[in-house]
Amino acid sequence: MAPQKPETFMLSTEAQQALPHDAQVALQQVDNLKYFLISAPVDWQPDQYIRRFLLPTGEYVSCVLWNNLFHISGTDIVRCLSFRFQAFGRPVKNSKKFEEGIFSDLRNLKSGTDASLEEPKSAFLDFLYKNNCIRTQKKQKVFYWYSVPHDRLFLDALERDLKREKMGQEATTVAVSEPALSFQYDSSQSLYEQLTKTQQANSSSFSAQQPAFPPGQSSSPVMRNMDAMPRPI
């Protein structure tokens, strides 16, 4: 059973299969990005400090090794989310307001546990700036790679805009193509809660269909590897 994606979990299976080819290609590109977000810190060379991923928008997202920890900048997080909204069929039309919302959400990630708080023009910020990972060297948090809840950030930003539209206010993104045009918003609970429940229901259904294995034995080496992954995104 295919995992539920934040971009399409509100659509029926039939609707997902009926998506236009362009939409399916765009969502596959999102999957490619997600794979990078999971796997980027693996298999680095001894003298390697940065690994890049080229987004279809032409911008790069970078995984940066500094002080033996892998990091991602707030600027690159926004780049990831801007691309995901474009692939979803809801491109960003008010970049400043969109970015402000994301950085407001990122305040929930605390220095020391989820991020490194860098002083202005520190050696780390200088490296990030020279590699186009940040736009300014002012004091800021740089986030630990596996501490960033990318799906949650996407859904929270989407929910903000859907609520704005429902109240007749200007949203930061606009639905222009599928699957965004078919996305049905239920305001009785948060999108993240709805996605979590859908994933749990699918997981329970999937587990019920699987043969029993002895304790400690996984049915798949892929599942064993995923079990060992640091905090899921």
Describe the residue ranges of each PLM region:
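Generic signal for short, ordered secondary-structure residues
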Residues: S12, Y60, V64, L81, ...
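Charged/polar, solvent-exposed surface patches and flexible loops
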Residues: Q28, Y35, S39, R79, ...
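Short, amphipathic alpha-helical interface elements at domain boundaries
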Residues: V61-K97
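Chromatin/DNA-recognition segments of nuclear transcriptional regulators
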Residues: S95-S182
